[in-house]
UniProtKB/Swiss-Prot annotation:
<comment type="similarity">
    <text>To M.tuberculosis Rv2926c.</text>
</comment>
<protein>
    <recommendedName>
        <fullName>Uncharacterized protein ML1660</fullName>
    </recommendedName>
</protein>
<dbReference type="InterPro" id="IPR003772">
    <property type="entry name" value="YceD"/>
</dbReference>
<dbReference type="Pfam" id="PF02620">
    <property type="entry name" value="YceD"/>
</dbReference>
Length: 217
């Protein structure tokens, strides 16, 4: 199976050439998640196993939890020819970096999502009768899994990640993480006693500035 895995400058390059008489569109996609499926053919039931590790080309996720740029994404997928379409099913796993919403501690974890995405061939019944964004599309014998992965990861990641379910958060007085210092002390004085302490404090004698000079009588 031929796979387009070359990268240049960490970006996808798309070269498009359109020709009349049948409107043939030819695209050369360079991306680690664009795969050539021409060996699959159009016979229903034909299957290709897709097991690869590819780098993430962007920060995928939410505000507080993401798959970082360049992080390894493990694909364990099955590409199957079904009727006039191609079905991609399996799992995608990747490491995540998040920030606990309570104590703001960095948390390293992983996410595993299930893909079950249909890709329609040009001019197929699915292509003609389905809205543009409802299914994926086979373009010049290739499928692009990027948006499918982004959508699946976005649904799976938590909106409010925590380092642990019982995270105590931050100290309300000084902002110290109570996970790191769970019992750090604070000298708490009742404001009335504090005022009384100031009133009973002994007067500090003021020193005269002599600088070697004598007082005038």
């Amino acid at each position: 199976m031929t796979v387009a895995l070359a990268l240049r400058d960490g970006c996808r390059r798309i070269s498009t050439m359109t020709r009349q008489y049948g409107v043939t569109t030819q695209r050369h996609l360079i991306s680690p998640v664009v795969f050539d499926i021409t060996p699959l053919g159009r016979r229903p039931g034909a299957i290709i196993a897709l097991q690869k590790t590819v780098p993430s080309l962007a920060r995928i996720g939410l505000e507080l939890v993401v798959i970082e740029w360049g992080a390894p994404i493990n694909l364990d997928l099955r590409v199957e020819s079904v009727s006039e379409d191609v079905l991609v099913a399996g799992t995608v796993t990747a490491p995540t970096v998040s920030e606990c919403v309570r104590c703001l501690t960095a948390v390293h974890g992983h996410v595993q999502v299930t893909l079950n995405q249909l890709f329609a061939y040009p001019y197929s019944a699915t292509k003609v009768t389905t809205e543009e964004d409802a299914v994926g599309h086979v373009v010049d014998g290739t499928i692009d899994l990027e948006q499918s992965i982004i959508d699946a990861v976005g649904i799976e990641l938590p909106f409010a990640p925590m380092c642990r379910s019982d995270c105590p958060g931050l100290c309300a007085e000084c902002g110290t993480s109570l996970v790191v210092e769970p019992g750090h002390p604070h000298d708490r004085i009742d404001p009335w006693w504090a005022k009384l302490t100031d009133m009973l404090a002994p007067d500090v004698p003021q020193t005269s500035e002599t600088d070697g000079s004598r007082s005038e009588w």
